[in-house]
UniProtKB/Swiss-Prot annotation:
Positions with biased composition (Low complexity): 29-40
Biased composition (Polar residues): 144-154
Gene: LINC00482
Organism: Homo sapiens (Human)
Protein name stated in the entry: Putative uncharacterized protein encoded by LINC00482
Residue stretches of biased makeup (Basic residues): 188-197
Ranges where the record places region Disordered: 1-52, 123-207
S-S bonds: none
Amino acid sequence: MPRSLKRAQLRSLLPRPPAVSHTQPWYRAAHPTTSPTAASRDVHPASGAVPGPWLVEGTAVREGPQLQDAVPQRPTRPSKALWPAQMSAAPAIRLGQMVPGDTRGLWGPQGTLLTWTYRGGQGGRWTRRAEGPREGTFAEQRPHFQSSGAQQESRLAMGPPPLGLGDAAGDGRGQTGQEKGRAEGRQARKSACKCPRKGPNPGPWTRAAAWWGRLEGAKASAKGEQVRDPGGHLWEQGHVSPCARFNQGHSCGSPKVSHTTWVS
């Protein structure tokens, strides 16, 4: 009998070690996995391990609910909410350990940028601010936002925030003296406004779109010129009006700005 065959036969008689099961809790606890499967739960901080970053498919992820980029979708009407429901609660976007002053920005639908600032305290206190909408598409603006990182003030701020949008968005910053004066002036001239009540019901997105339309209105030279906002909705530049108030789906600017009407 060849020596190699004899050795193989003897080896087959030896007891084999028990098969290692990747589903056994003791194995998963001793061998942290990088696969986002059920086995990952054993190394998650919720299981008693030290809180901190843990790997999922080779990407460092903080514990807790993750902040996801909202994919803009064309709404059926501009009165759709400015941000999805999952972005309405600040704790839902908390990322690991943060210090007061940390800011997280999130692109919402139609190119709006929602900024959350952590104010400290047990449980976390957040303030949020909506900026925009921005000119350009989501794909064009996203790289700029990613390169800006977390800052106190976003470098994407292109001009002042929409009038009235801050309070409508719920950041609670209140009115400044200038805004209060504008509001009083609008109320005083309210009865004199003869603008048609055309467009969707008022809402945060509508106000933002109206603000965007006012900027475009300043550029529109020909009466009746139509422009399309970042959300894909058509606005028509019309007559010049002295009133300055936001109405259903349109805004009348100063005498220097054309009237803007939501078309489709």
